[in-house]
Amino acid sequence: MARELILKLGKKITDRVDVKLGMTKLDENSPEYYGLASVVTDEMAELALAMKVRVPTTPAEIGKKVGKDPVYVEQLFDQMSMIGLLEYNWENADHHKQWTLPIFVPGSAELMNMNLQQVETHPEIAQFFERMSFLPLTKITCMVPPGGAGVGMHVIPVEKAIPATNESVDVEHISHWLKKYEGHIGVGYCSCRNAMRIQGEGCGELQDELCIAVGQFADYCRETGKGRDITYEEAMEIIQRAEDNGYVHQITNIDGEDKIFAICNCALGSCFALRTSQLFNTPNMSASAYRAHVDAEKCVACGKCAEVCPAGAAKLGQKLCTKTGPVVYPKQPLPDDNHWGEHMWSPNYKDDNQKQCHESGTAPCKTACPAHIAVQGYINLAAQGRYLDALKLIKQDNPFPAVCGSICNRRCEEACTRGDVDRAVAIDEIKKFVAEQELQADKRYIPKVITHRGIADPYPEKIAIIGAGPASLSCAYYLANMGYENVTVFDKNEVPGGMLTLGIPSFRLEKDVVNAEIEVLREMGVHFQCGVEIGKDLTIDQLREQGYKGFYLAIGAQKSAPIGVPGEELSGVYGGVDFLRRVNLGKKPRIGKKCAVIGGGNVAMDVCRTAIRLGAKDTYIIYRRSQAEMPADAEEVAEAMEEGVQFRFLSAPAEILGENGKVKALKVEIMELGEPDAKGRRKPVGTGKFETIEVTSVIGAIGQRVDLGHIAPEAMAFNRNGTVQADGVTYQTAQPDIFAGGDVVTGPKFAIDAIAAGREGAISLHRYVHEGQSLTLARDPREFYELDKKQAVVPIDCFDAPARQTVAHDASKAKTFSNDRITFTEAQVKAEASRCLGCGVSVVDQNKCIGCGLCTTRCEFDAIHLTRDVPEASRMYRTEDKMKAILPHMVKRAAKLTIKDIKEKCAK
């Protein structure tokens, strides 16, 4: 049965108009009731009912009202303050201590959640806070004028983003507030993040010390154990850390002009204050006086502004005109111009606001790259000679640019709009030039750790990475970059790198390049245990016993697929990746003078060229389709041909012939092409005609398989081809603490695909090892769309650009294990960069923009700025006076909509 005093207290404090007017009656299921009833006694409720909301009072005054001893009242007041029902107040002539009964939000609902032990014991308090930041606002948000009218919180911009020449006012500057309250500044845990964690809906933005208390509220937090004192300098460090993490600064907005009690650093996925504008699509509830604007001439569509924009206002579009004119982008409807209701809300705003690209498309290079590197951006920086900045930009999305500069399959170049004019920009060669700047230890770029807690307080959770290939290394890199100090990479091989080190020959990827980029991980604090086979030397259960909280399985597909013909057991028959591994470990497999390589992919090209370097005089590629169907990179095929490899197209192995247990010859069947298969390639069909080729070795390079070795298969589910089943978004396997990525999940793909998967694995592991975090909520989907190149109009001056630069070769390194490709010169890089058409651009919808300024912190091109478009948004009101601001705006809006309705009716 409901407690009567709690019902009365809930009605007294609530901001719900329907409850205040008696239209809705509270009961046990009302948040006002269950939130208070969980921790407030009837004795406390009796005292609170004798108080006025937001009016300071003393124990003596309340004791007199209720007929209680003031000493007893003060003791209860202290308990009520610890709970979070009351606040302290010293604003009086002699600064004696008073107590205040605050509103629920912002007020006691937050304070009750800041008592961490209390909310763990009573998780219903978290739901109480969430509901009380929602229910009172459902009918009113569309009527609120710019500035918020004293309702809740208000965005305050990144201070560096406010133009120096702008007519800003003091209340728009964070430094103003921190200087005003210097000596009374504190910090505490974020109540929104904590409430969402308790409800299992955290988004990876942890409830660490991020919310700054000022004035007497800071003193209250210290005295009640909800926070601690900090200096002005410490507060500014928190502000900077928040900006690094992409958190929005907000100030309380319920106390009138030039008065606040908190500066919060808010995350879209958790913040109930940001929800007031984002869920209801009513930016006036949050927005500052500023709006972001893009200088399209300077913008290079790196997309970093879109990544950080909490409102989904900044998105990637295209700079190139279409045949019908410039692309016109949609604007978010606003309540001042439209009838509003739930049909205009955005219930999925946490996910929708993560979308970074207009469906009409953006630069094809960024879209095509699996890691969605800011190609247009780093090309622009390289053109300016800002090579370190270019490297920093690349490594935000790809920790191994030097590796990829040597071996990437260049999907960005395949998609390049320039390729429809003449030839694609040599993107990979520019990246390689930029990346090789840091191969020298003294020039190495170590990224700044971006953690919620600060560099001095890293995450202690232990995470095991199984395998040391590109997916594993990428995952480890991003975890270290987040601030994890106990990331350990385990690999059964004696050296890290996986296929980068052992599966790709040095003449394509020099091992010093791989080692230099791995060394960056060591300097970031990643630990390596090589020569340790998980499942054999150490089991996953043993690692769990050692305190490991999460695992990333990325052991690749390092087992050669069998050729599947008689004679495969003969001496001189090798699997392609096994052969390359032995060579990379310094061994020299005996292949004789005549070697046949079965297959038509990149591994086959690596194998045949390696065979030449081991002394084979006659090397054959045996491929069952024609050259047109060959999946290997055309450039690698050409290089193999130049080195003397003989290609036998439309030939399939039938039998390996031997003598005295050794390979003597290869029998092949002549094929012809039939109907296309599911991938569009014509199927090879046997003709029944055979030929025999005299060879001394046969190397099968027809595919790779996953080999889990001694890792217990019962721990996970598998696909028919032996790959591990993992969620397509989170990469979580059937074992909740094991995530997987790279070739072990997809089957053989390219390094850049594995690198992209590693980043997603790190995001999932970060969320998983912290209790109450959703793996999917408010997660960046990394979805980009390519602009319609058929409709794009390229600028006339693009035809005056230089021809594509060509790679030179060092003749002295030909047919050796050294890479004979010569990196572009600086002049070549700048000439090649000038060929970029600059297809993409960022576009800001000012109707959605809340003027936080985070976009400006990410732009390296001076292309996005804030302007003070809505100065009235800096007007501050007391919550008691909110209707003085809302009513005039409501009347004006109603008149505007009436006129609009009449015009629309007349038009019909």
Which residue stretches match the model-derived regions?
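Ferredoxin-like iron-sulfur electron-transfer modules
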Residues: 68, 99, 250-263, 279-308, ...
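A short, conserved structural fragment
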Residues: 81-92, 314-315, 864
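Short, amphipathic alpha-helical interaction segments positioned at domain boundaries
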Residues: 95-135, 886
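Flanking helices and flexible, charged tails adjoining ferredoxin-like Fe-S electron-transfer domains
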Residues: 311-364, 379, 425-427, 431-463, ...
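Beta1-alpha1 glycine-rich phosphate/pyrophosphate-binding loop at the start
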Residues: 373-376, 382-383, 424-428, 461, ...
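Glycine-rich dinucleotide-binding loop and its adjacent helix/turn
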Residues: 434-457, 516-536, 560-614, 719-734
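FAD-site-proximal beta/loop scaffold in flavoenzymes
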Residues: 569-593, 676-748
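A conserved FAD-binding loop/helix module that cradles the flavin
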Residues: 744-772
